[in-house]
Amino acid sequence: MAKCNAVAGFNALNGVQLNLFTTDELKAIHYATMEVLMDPGIQVSDPEARQIFKENGCEVNEQTNVVKIPEYLVRRALQLAPSRFVLWGRDKKYNTVQEAGGKVHWTCFGTGVKMCKYQEGKYVTVDSVEQDIADIAKLCDWAENIDYFSLPVSARDIAGQGAQDVHETFTPLTNTAKHFHHIDPVGENVEYYRDIVNAYYGGDEEEARKKPIFSMLLCPTSPLELSVNACQVIIKGARFGMPVNVLSMAMSGGSSPVYLAGTLVTHNAEVLAGITLAQLTVPGAKVWYGSSTTTFDLKKGTAPVGSPELGLISASVAKLAQFYGLPAFVAGTOSDAKIPDNQAGHEKTMTCLLPALAGANTLYGAGMLELGMTFSMEQLVIDNDIIKMTKKALQGVPVNEETLAVESIQKVGIGNNFLALKQTRQLVNYPSDPMLIDRRMFGDWAAAGSKDLAAAAHEKVVDVLKNHVVKPIDADILKDMKAVVDKADKAFRGM
C-alpha cells in the first residue's frame, strides 16, 4: 500500500489535543494584560524588587509601592526566559524536561495541612507531620506516573519548634531520588535550601546550578500584588540557579473577575510581573508559568478545585504559556471530595484530562482531597492509575502503514480472530493496563476478596512503605546536609 505518516492530532503536539483559543483571542488576553500592568500596575511590597524594577525603567510609586511595568520589559523578559530546562533527580533516570509545548508530566499535590488516614474501610483526618512527608516521598518514588515530587503537606509538628520549611526541604530530598519542588518556601531561608543542595553536591555550587535537584514555587497575592516573600523567592531563586514557579491562585468572582477571560487577564498580569522580575534579576533564569487559579463558589464560600472551571482555567493557562514560549505548571487531578470515593474519581479525571489535552507541562494534584486541604496516600495510588490511563488517551490514534494493519487483516480474513496473530502477542502491553483499577468480571473479583478500590490502594501503600527502597545518599554527604538543618533550627531558636 502507499506509505503515509499521518499522526493523530495537529500543530506541534502529537496525539489528542484541545485547542481553546484562536491566536487573536490569545493576543486580546495579552494586550488586556499589558493595559493592566500599566493601569493600575502591580503592588510590589519588597523594596529590593521595587529597586530592580525602577533601575530597569519602570515607574515606581514609593508611597503606594505600585510598579507600572511597560510592555517592552515584559517582551524582553519573555525573550530571555528559557523555553526548556531540565529538572534533575538524585537519580538521573528521573530527570524531567520542562518545555513549552512539550511532554505532559505529573507531580503530587501541595501543600495540605491534614492527612486522610485509611483505617479498615473508615477514614480519619489528622494534622500532617514530618514523617508523612517522608512516607509520601517514598510512595512517589515508587509511583511510575509521578514524574517529580512536590511538597505535599506541612510538617506541622515542627511548626514553632524549628525551621519548618528547612525540614520540609531536607526530608523530601532524602526520601526520594526524584526532583523536589518546594511549594511553600520562605524567602529569608532560601540560603539554607541552597546550602543543603550544595552539600549534596559535595560543596560544588557550580554543579548544583547545572543539575538542579531542587526548585521553588511562589504565589502572587491576588489581585495584583507581589509580596515580600514572593519577591525574595524569585530574586534568590534566580541568583542561585534554582528553577522558580510563579503561580497565581486567583479566585474568579473573589480575587479576580467573575468572567474567566477577565480572570485570565489578572492571572496573566501577576505571573508575568513575577517572571519579569526574575529575568531582570538574572537574564535567562529558569521559570514556569504557573496556575492554581479557580473559581470562588459564591454560594458555598469555598474555592473548589474539582470543578470544570478549574480544568478550563488550567487548560487556558497552558495555552497562554505556549503562546509565550514558557513551560506551564497547572493544577489538575484535583478534587473537593473528602475521601477516595466516586466524587474524587469523577473530579480528578475531569480536571486531569482538560489541561493534559491542552499540553500543560506539569499537572499537580495527585493525592489531594478536600479542596487542597488534605492528602491521602491511597488516593495517590489511585491517581497513579488515573494518570496512566490519561497518558494512554493522550496518544490518540496514530495512523501509519503499520497501524492500519492491512496485511494482518488480509491474513486473518473473514470471521476469524486476531488473538493468535504474532503481532497481537508481541503487543500484549499495547492496550491500557491500570495497576489497581479492576477489569475482572464480578465472579473473579468476588473470589479474590471483593475489595473496593480504596482497600486495594491501602494494601499497595502498606506494601510500598515496607518494601520499596529509595536510592540512598552517602553517609558523609547526608551528615553535611543534616548539619544545615541543625544550623537553621539553632537560628530559629535564637541559639
Curated annotation (Swiss-Prot):
Q: Which UniProt keywords apply?
A: Methanogenesis, Methyltransferase, Pyrrolysine, Transferase
> Which biological process terms from the Gene Ontology are attached to this UniProt entry?
methanogenesis; methylation
Catalysed reaction equations from the record: Co(I)-[trimethylamine-specific corrinoid protein] + trimethylamine + H(+) = methyl-Co(III)-[trimethylamine-specific corrinoid protein] + dimethylamine
Record-listed E.C. numbers: 2.1.1.250
**A Gene Ontology molecular function term of the record:** trimethylamine methyltransferase activity
**Keyword set includes Methyltransferase:** yes
Which Pfam families does the record cross-reference, listed alphabetically? MTTB
Q: Which residues cross the membrane?
A: none
> Which pathway, per its entry?
One-carbon metabolism; methanogenesis from trimethylamine
Q: What does this protein do?
A: Catalyzes the transfer of a methyl group from trimethylamine to the corrinoid cofactor of MttC.
Q: How does it assemble?
A: Can form a complex with MttC.
Protein family (similarity comment): Belongs to the trimethylamine methyltransferase family.
List the protein's name.
Answer: Trimethylamine methyltransferase MttB1
List the gene name: mttB1
